[in-house]
């Protein structure tokens, strides 16, 4: 593994979404949002469980009606991951899901009602120890801010966020996190930079409405990557017009790429050329699918020839360097074996699983020794 100086994260206060710590140095949480009808309890539960399986720390669920709130009660009883209820316009829905054990409320104080209604929601959240996320979005800025600035700007998003923060400050409530999302990468990044200088609360990162699976992943990687590399951000969501499971995968890929939080295999693979001695692309695609269940952090390099292969293998947990008929296998930088190119996928899967088990056992022993 390549050595690098750790990113110095912005200091923030600590809140808890269910049992997940947010801020104050806690691991950056990766979350997604269901796209089922919340009133379809079975479909929503199945999607949440699919998100849990790929590592989601938190899942947000839209609760637009009282019927959805009743469904939320049933959903909450069937899943383990903390749930955030996304509430707009009707403060009574927030009060209802609070009764049903919601782990966090995502509200916009600007559309939830008057001061008295906001106070009722905040008092309920305080009594039940439920944090709140203030969610500001460039696409739904208050009309007076639209008129003042003419268009969404970083200053407009900041002013909107601070207006809502002031709502909670006046009510002496500090268990909250804030987001200032936009679909434009530069607008979102600058808005978060400004906000990070103004408040101490945790920040939830996102490039909203980023696009489809490919373009949305690229936009999110650029925007979130810039902020995370500057130490800004305590939770994140990659917003894609795609299966929410992909949001979690891309989120962890961003964190892995920045070496902020490792989960699963970090594949290093060449784009291939006429020098490749085996099917690199097919091997990588197959292994990514077969090894999705592996959560052990490890770097695996799969290089088709001897130009860059040995160098990458030296800094990988496991590395393959393409050779004629057989390819070299490296473990922790040391050449260990040769693999038959015609059976590369099965052999490499077996070696990776064995290495993951070995690393897991070593960590288990380390934990036991520390506990003693």
Curated annotation (Swiss-Prot):
Keyword Oxidoreductase included in the entry's annotation: yes
One GO BP annotation of this record: isopentenyl diphosphate biosynthetic process, methylerythritol 4-phosphate pathway
Root EC class: oxidoreductase
Pathway: Isoprenoid biosynthesis; isopentenyl diphosphate biosynthesis via DXP pathway; isopentenyl diphosphate from 1-deoxy-D-xylulose 5-phosphate: step 5/6
Gene Ontology MF annotations: 4 iron, 4 sulfur cluster binding; 4-hydroxy-3-methylbut-2-en-1-yl diphosphate synthase activity (ferredoxin); 4-hydroxy-3-methylbut-2-enyl-diphosphate synthase activity (flavodoxin); iron ion binding
Amino acids binding [4Fe-4S] cluster: 270, 273, 305, 312
EC number of this enzyme: 1.17.7.3
InterPro entries: Dihydropteroate_synth-like_sf, IspG_bac, IspG_bac-typ, NO2/SO3_Rdtase_4Fe4S_sf
Record's cofactor remark: Binds 1 [4Fe-4S] cluster.
Cofactor names: [4Fe-4S] cluster
Catalytic activities: (2E)-4-hydroxy-3-methylbut-2-enyl diphosphate + oxidized [flavodoxin] + H2O + 2 H(+) = 2-C-methyl-D-erythritol 2,4-cyclic diphosphate + reduced [flavodoxin]
Function: Converts 2C-methyl-D-erythritol 2,4-cyclodiphosphate (ME-2,4cPP) into 1-hydroxy-2-methyl-2-(E)-butenyl 4-diphosphate.
Family the UniProt entry places it in: Belongs to the IspG family.
Protein name, as recorded: 4-hydroxy-3-methylbut-2-en-1-yl diphosphate synthase (flavodoxin)
Record organism: Salmonella gallinarum (strain 287/91 / NCTC 13346)
Organism lineage: Bacteria, Pseudomonadati, Pseudomonadota, Gammaproteobacteria, Enterobacterales
Record gene name: ispG
């Amino acid at each position: 593994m390549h050595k690098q100086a750790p990113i110095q994260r912005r200091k923030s206060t600590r809140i808890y979404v269910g049992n997940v710590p947010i801020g104050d140095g806690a691991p950056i949480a990766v979350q997604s949002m269901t796209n089922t009808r919340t009133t379809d309890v079975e479909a929503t539960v199945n999607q949440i469980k699919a998100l849990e399986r790929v590592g989601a720390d938190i899942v947000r669920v839209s609760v637009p009606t009282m019927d959805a709130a009743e469904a939320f009660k049933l959903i909450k009883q069937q899943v383990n991951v903390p749930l955030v209820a996304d509430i707009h316009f009707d403060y009574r829905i927030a009060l209802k899901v609070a009764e049903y054990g919601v782990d966090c409320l995502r509200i916009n104080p600007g559309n939830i009602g008057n001061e008295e209604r906001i106070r009722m929601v905040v008092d309920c959240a305080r009594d039940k120890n439920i944090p709140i996320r203030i969610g500001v979005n460039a696409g739904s800025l208050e009309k007076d801010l639209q008129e003042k600035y003419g268009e969404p700007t970083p200053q407009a998003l900041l002013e909107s966020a601070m207006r809502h923060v002031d709502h909670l400050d006046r009510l002496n409530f500090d268990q909250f996190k804030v987001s200032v999302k936009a679909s434009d990468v530069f607008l979102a990044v600058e808005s978060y930079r400004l906000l990070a200088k103004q408040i101490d609360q945790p920040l939830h990162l996102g490039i909203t409405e980023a696009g489809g699976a490919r373009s949305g992943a690229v936009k999110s990687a650029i925007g979130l990557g810039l902020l995370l590399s500057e130490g800004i951000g305590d939770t994140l969501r990659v917003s894609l017009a795609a299966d929410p499971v992909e949001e979690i995968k891309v989120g962890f890929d961003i964190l892995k790429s920045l070496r902020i939080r490792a989960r699963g295999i970090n594949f290093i693979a060449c784009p291939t050329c006429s020098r490749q001695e085996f099917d690199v692309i097919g091997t990588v695609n197959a292994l990514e699918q077969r090894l999705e269940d592996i959560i052990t952090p490890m770097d695996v390099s799969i290089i088709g020839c001897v130009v860059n292969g040995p160098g990458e293998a030296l800094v990988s947990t496991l590395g393959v360097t393409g050779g004629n008929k057989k390819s070299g296998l490296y473990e922790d930088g040391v050449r260990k074996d040769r693999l038959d190119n015609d059976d590369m996928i099965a052999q490499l899967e077996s070696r990776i699983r064995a290495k993951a088990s070995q690393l897991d056992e070593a960590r288990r022993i380390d934990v036991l020794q520390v506990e003693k």
